[in-house]
Swiss-Prot record:
Keywords: Copper, Hydrolase, Metal-binding, Oxidoreductase, Transferase, Zinc. Belongs to the purine nucleoside phosphorylase YfiH/LACC1 family. It comes from the Bacteria. Its EC number is 2.4.2.1, 3.5.4.4, 2.4.2.28. It catalyses: adenosine + phosphate = alpha-D-ribose 1-phosphate + adenine; S-methyl-5'-thioadenosine + phosphate = 5-(methylsulfanyl)-alpha-D-ribose 1-phosphate + adenine; inosine + phosphate = alpha-D-ribose 1-phosphate + hypoxanthine; adenosine + H2O + H(+) = inosine + NH4(+). One of its GO terms (molecular function) is oxidoreductase activity. It holds the Pfam family Cu-oxidase_4. This is Purine nucleoside phosphorylase BB_0467. Purine nucleoside enzyme that catalyzes the phosphorolysis of adenosine and inosine nucleosides, yielding D-ribose 1-phosphate and the respective free bases, adenine and hypoxanthine. Also catalyzes the phosphorolysis of S-methyl-5'-thioadenosine into adenine and S-methyl-5-thio-alpha-D-ribose 1-phosphate. Also has adenosine deaminase activity. Transmembrane segments: none annotated. The lineage of its organism: Bacteria, Pseudomonadati, Spirochaetota, Spirochaetia, Spirochaetales. It comes from Borreliella burgdorferi (strain ATCC 35210 / DSM 4680 / CIP 102532 / B31).
């Protein structure tokens, strides 16, 4: 994967026929402003599709007539005419592309979505649409990484009975008596038994001052977008 920094966004290039981007400062939109007019780097032919995100594990198959702002946190589509959009302020954006079936997907995966296994549910959706998992390319976009994402002992205790010790050891780090969580590591280890092509941007929303971070700024948000070319 090649990460390219543009004026208003990062681009994650894994193939010539798909576009994956993550916006950065000073680009800033409110939800009610989501439209092609305000995403001037998205082709006018693409219909913007997005959800009312509530940290769920709900995923929608998107057709051209999909109604925006339904409650959920994942989108999948085989349409050439749509751009899938999700908004972030520290949570993990996960992009999907089947280079054979030409299917795109996008997940907003906060810790709640991750712990509810939304990424596995997206894989099931791809298989249901005819994808072979070996043809999938998955990209973890910018998120609040374990260098910065401090959590409480109660947070760790609440998930300790739900997942294996190996998975937790791969996802949590202790430094100087403090506990830190890495959302991408959690999801990466969930997928360890699958034959998948996975790429990690390794960009931290808290560290990088050109990205919006709720924990650092308490305001604003970035957007992840994916569309076929």
């Amino acid at each position: 994967m090649k990460t390219i920094e543009h004026e208003l966004y990062y681009e994650f290039r894994i193939a010539d026929d798909v576009k994956m981007i993550y916006t950065k400062k000073p680009f800033n939109l409110k939800l009610k402003e989501l439209s092609n007019d305000n995403f001037n780097f998205v082709p006018r032919s693409k219909k913007i599709k997005y959800l009312k995100q509530l940290h769920t594990d709900i995923i929608y198959k998107v057709e051209d007539d999909f109604i925006n702002f339904q409650e959920g946190d994942g989108l999948i589509s085989s349409s050439l005419d749509v751009a899938l959009v999700a908004y972030f302020a520290d949570c993990l954006p996960i992009y999907f592309y089947d280079s054979v079936k030409k299917i795109i997907g996008l997940i907003h995966s906060g810790y709640k979505g991750s712990f509810n296994l939304i990424i596995l549910k997206m894989l099931f959706m791809f298989e249901k649409m005819g994808s072979a998992l070996k043809d999938l390319k998955i990209v973890f976009g910018p998120y609040n990484r374990s260098c910065c994402y401090e959590v409480s002992e109660i947070f760790l205790k609440e998930v300790s009975n739900k997942f294996s010790k190996d998975l937790l050891n791969a996802s949590f780090v202790t430094r100087d008596g403090k506990i830190y969580f890495d959302n991408a590591s959690f999801n990466l280890n969930l997928l360890s038994s699958f034959n998948l092509n996975i790429y990690n941007s390794k960009l931290c929303t808290y560290c990088l001052k050109n990205l919006y971070s709720y924990r650092r700024l308490r305001e604003s948000q970035s957007y992840a977008l994916i569309w076929r070319i």
